[in-house]
């Protein structure tokens, strides 16, 4: 599985709304994301696992 990089655009309740570097929009439940995820965070989705990237 190819790694996919996302930027969190907004958080509404229990869901984060994000856009990949390829422009694909996605919505993910916050409990699945790493602690510290916030609007503007960069995330990596690889091997069915989320990683919060350093700023």
Where are the language model's segments positioned?
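Structural detector for short beta-strands of small beta-barrel domains
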Residues: 1-11
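Short aromatic-glycine-enriched beta-strand elements
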Residues: 14-18
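Short, structured beta-strand/loop micro-motifs enriched in basic residues and often containing a Trp
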Residues: 20-28
């Amino acid at each position: 599985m190819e790694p996919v990089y996302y930027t969190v655009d907004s958080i509404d309740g229990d869901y984060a709304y994000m856009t990949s570097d390829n422009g694909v929009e996605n919505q993910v439940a916050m409990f699945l994301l790493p602690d510290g995820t916030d609007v503007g965070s960069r995330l990596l989705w690889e091997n069915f696992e989320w990683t919060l990237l350093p700023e």
